Amino acid sequence: AMRRVRTLLEFGCEITVVSPEVCEELREKVLWKKKRYDETDLESLGNVGEASRFIFVLAAAAPEVNEKIVCDCRKKKIPVNNASNRDQCDFYFPGIAKDGDTVVGITSGGGDHRLAAKISAAVRQILRTIAV
C-alpha cells in the first residue's frame, strides 16, 4: 500500500489514512485518522455523487477487515483496491515511468506485477534516452 500512496501523492492526491498506526514517512503528508475503520468512515463521504471522487486502497493485516471495507465501498459505489486480493479490486495501480511531464502507466490487469515492473523499468530507460 505504501507504493500506492506514494504514487497518489506524487500526482497531487489528498490522502486520508484510517489506521491505528501510520509510518513516520506518511504522517506529514496525509490526513491521519488514528483509529480502526468502521462504517462511519464512509458515511462521512455523503451521497454517492460526492463519493465518486474517492477511491479506497486497502492493506489491513486482517483479511476480514479488508473484505468488510470492500463490501461497504461497493454498496456506496466507491471504487476499491484491496492490495491483498486482486479479485477485490475495481482498478489496478499501474507501474509508472515518468520523465518530466511525460508519464506512462503500465499494468498487467492485476495478473503479473513483476512483468509490469520490468516493462516500467524498460520504459523509464527509454524515456531517459529520449530526453538526452
Where in this protein do the model-derived segments appear?
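Adenine nucleotide-associated cytosolic modules
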Residues: 1-132
